[in-house]
């Protein structure tokens, strides 16, 4: 009798809930050891003299479902002491491609005369 009650009450068929989470976006930059970082420091000191720029990929990732369309990202880029076009260039559009949940936004840092003696900072904000 106990076995019959256990078998009778053990099954409850339900449809699982679908994944749902609020949509969001964040920087997902990691070191080679998979440690999350929010700041990157680069130097031209160890680069050959003929290296005139360094391309820095900034990984941007979404939270939530992928979309069937490209989605522009409201990315703010600014600097207190670096000038776009002179000290750096923004090479890729700030757009999450259709059917993707992440992309690399590339910032090109230029080797200028000023960078030899002065620290330049560029800030990115979502």
Mark where each language-model region is:
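Sec-dependent signal peptide recognition
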Residues: 1-2
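Short beta-strand and strand-turn-strand segments in soluble, beta-rich domains
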Residues: 78-94, 101
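Intrinsic-disorder/low-complexity, polar/charged segments enriched in Ser/Thr/Lys/Arg/Asp/Glu/Gln
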Residues: 53-57, 101-104, 121
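Short, hydrophobic beta-strand segments
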Residues: 97-101, 105-113
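Enriched for extracellular/lumenal, surface-exposed ectodomains of secreted and cell-surface proteins
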Residues: 124-126
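C-terminal motif of bacterial Sec signal peptides marking the signal peptidase cleavage site
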Residues: 6-10
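Acidic/polar, low-complexity intrinsically disordered N-terminal segments immediately downstream
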Residues: 12-85
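Short glycine/proline/serine/threonine-rich loop/turn segments at secondary-structure transition edges
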Residues: 113-121
């Amino acid at each position: 009798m106990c076995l019959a009650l256990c078998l009778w009450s053990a099954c409850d068929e339900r449809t699982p809930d679908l994944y749902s989470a609020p949509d969001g976006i964040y920087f997902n930059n990691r070191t080679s050891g998979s440690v999350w970082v929010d700041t990157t420091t680069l130097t031209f000191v160890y680069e050959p003299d003929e290296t005139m720029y360094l391309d820095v990929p900034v990984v941007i990732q979404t939270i939530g479902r992928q979309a069937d369309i490209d989605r522009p990202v409201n990315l703010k880029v600014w600097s207190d002491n670096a000038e776009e076009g002179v000290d750096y260039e923004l090479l890729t559009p700030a757009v999450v491609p259709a059917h993707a949940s992440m992309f690399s936004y590339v910032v090109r840092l230029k080797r200028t005369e000023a960078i030899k003696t002065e620290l330049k900072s560029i800030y990115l904000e979502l």
